[in-house]
Amino acid sequence: LYEFLAGSKNLGKSSISNHIKNDQFVLKDNYKTYLSFFDGSMDDDSLGRELISLAKELNIEIFEFNEIKNFDTEGNIDKHYFDKIILAVGPWSKMLLEQNNIKSQKDIDFIKGSHLIINRKSEFGLMFSGICKSRYIFALPYKDFTLLGTTEEKVSHPELPEISKNEIKYLIDSFNQIL
């Protein structure tokens, strides 16, 4: 489906196969089939700058580097009125809505992604279950390296998410189990 929707912007073909066509990765015998896939890799900072530039070209007034604490659903921020408020603060949305007594239609869990860049080049992406068998891990090409990660660990607060030594060990051990 991704390939169909992407059309000419397709990054690569996903496939299910019985072997890997790359000397860098050799699956252990008990892994008979694998899913190879391609995922986008983006520069979030560059994308953000591009969107800000485009918005300014459209005469949209943007207020950057301003801490907003008090707002309502009518467009009021402190003592100013705005036609629209875009709350683009990721995991902090839940806390800001609660602080301003605004009921959300969605419940937000705080999760963190754990990612490692390992010194091993890959030309395709893999997704596999980790050693605990309840989480999936991905290994994606990233420049001349491999990006190894997962995004399924709940945390109690979004501030300063850090990868733990246990999570590093989990990712590496899980990756090593299939090679």
Residue positions per predicted region:
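Active-site substrate-recognition segment that forms the wall
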Residues: 87-179
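A structural signal for short hydrophobic beta-strand segments in well-ordered beta-sheet cores
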Residues: 68-71, 137-139
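Core beta-strand elements of the Rossmann-like FAD/NAD(P) dinucleotide-binding domain
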Residues: 77-84, 88
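Hydrophobic residues embedded in beta-strands of well-ordered beta-sheets
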Residues: 74-77, 146
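Flavin (FAD/FMN) cofactor-binding and adjacent substrate-gating region
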Residues: 1-63, 70, 143
